Amino acid sequence: MDFIVEKAAELGASELWPLVCARGLVHAPGVERIARWRRLALAAAKQSQSSSAMNVRAPLGFDDLIRSVPRTTLAVICTQGAEPLSRVIRRAHPRAILIAIGPEGDFDNAERAKTSDAGFVVAGLGPNRLRSETAALGAVSIAQGLLHDAEGSGEDAESE
């Protein structure tokens, strides 16, 4: 997770919400670990000359995630074999994006149903099965690139 925090901050993600999933391989981190992630995000922001540090939130469960997504945010759940994330973003023209990346075992059926009921859009990152770290950083890269393209065209954009 340290690697994801550091690299997502360097790529310009504005927030990271650690998600506790049914198939997650790791228990929810403690206060010390979250403080470490926040320090890593701050250091990465300085290193990448970002104007602001990524906000690392305390871990939250799936139901809390769904309740926390602002209505104006494009909420996406990534899964293998779905429509490409880049296409989903281009079609939606979002100002902000929340991208849920599953654990190594992927999201379970109940989690998928909850996100579907909450209006999350399903998107993929290509045909290969990716580790969570790779998926998270690939998704941030895609989203940031497309949001910055939108900014260049006069639209206001922010990534979560």
Tell me the role of every PLM-derived stretch.
Residues 7-11, 33-34, 90-95, 113-118, ...:
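Short, solvent-exposed amphipathic alpha-helical segments in soluble enzyme
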Residues 28-30, 64-69, 86-90, 110-112, ...:
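Short, well-ordered secondary-structure micro-motifs
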Residues 23-25, 82, 104-105, 144:
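Short, glycine/serine-rich, charged loops/turns that create anion-binding
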Residues 60-66, 83-85, 130:
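A short acidic, often aromatic-flanked loop/helix-cap motif at beta-alpha or helix-coil junctions
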Residues 1-77:
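RNA substrate-binding interface of SAM-dependent RNA methyltransferases
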Residues 72-114, 120-125:
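Active-site/ligand-binding-proximal alpha/beta "capping" segment
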Residues 54, 104, 128, 132:
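Glycine- and other small-residue-rich loops at beta-strand/loop junctions that grip anionic moieties
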Residues 109-160:
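Structured adenosyl-cofactor binding patch, chiefly the S-adenosyl-L-methionine
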